[in-house]
A protein has these predicted regions:
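Protein-protein interaction/assembly regions in multi-subunit complexes
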Residues: 1-188
């Protein structure tokens, strides 16, 4: 308890602890430091792949694994669902680990904690896995009514473009954060 005592005094704006001590014990041919760096590299690669797939949403010639669903009901006009269906893929020279709860949680937490404010396009973001045996995630986002994208008469293409831009920005920021984590893990 005393060893972990320091983390109880480090809280974020939501009163959640953000100070943790992790001990990585390698059961692998890589040592603990190499495993830590490799895990962060996997997250960066996954964020980059997700960002590339987001860009395919705007390209009508490409078939995208991400779809946006808008509601026609007047009371739900400001709500949009994003369905992400990106399963793991193993090829000869590369492995895509798939879009998973780790990636969804990282994106949701970053947008909620760092990108949503009184003037931002989004007012709310949350996600859930549709079924434990499916690689399908449903993000629910709400537009800020004080933002111009929150108006009921804004077209879907403009909203989709703005959402892709917001999500790409989140991926870029997270890539930078994980890059810094790798540098600190390598002692640079």
């Amino acid at each position: 308890f005393l060893k972990e005592g320091q983390r109880y005094y480090h809280r974020d704006n939501n009163n959640e602890s953000y100070w943790y001590n992790f001990d990585i014990e390698s059961q692998h041919f890589m040592d603990a430091k190499e495993l830590f760096v490799h895990a962060n590299e996997i997250i960066i690669k996954s964020l980059d792949t997700f960002k590339e797939e987001l860009e395919n949403v705007l390209n009508e010639d490409e078939k995208s694994l991400i779809h946006f669903k808008y509601h026609n009901d007047e009371s739900k006009k400001s709500i949009v669902n994003m369905i992400v269906e990106m399963p793991a893929v193993i090829q000869i020279n590369s492995i895509w680990h798939g879009f998973d709860d780790t990636l969804a949680s990282i994106i949701q937490a970053h947008i909620s904690n760092h990108m949503i404010n009184g003037t931002s396009a989004l007012n709310l973001i949350g996600y859930k896995r549709t079924h434990p045996l499916e690689d399908k995630y449903l993000f629910t986002m709400s537009f800020n009514p004080r933002h111009n994208l929150g108006s009921a008469d804004m077209d879907e293409k403009t909203r989709t473009s703005a959402l892709v831009q917001e999500l790409s920005q989140a991926c870029n920021e997270l890539t930078g954060i994980f890059g810094e984590i790798i540098k600190s893990g390598m002692g640079l």
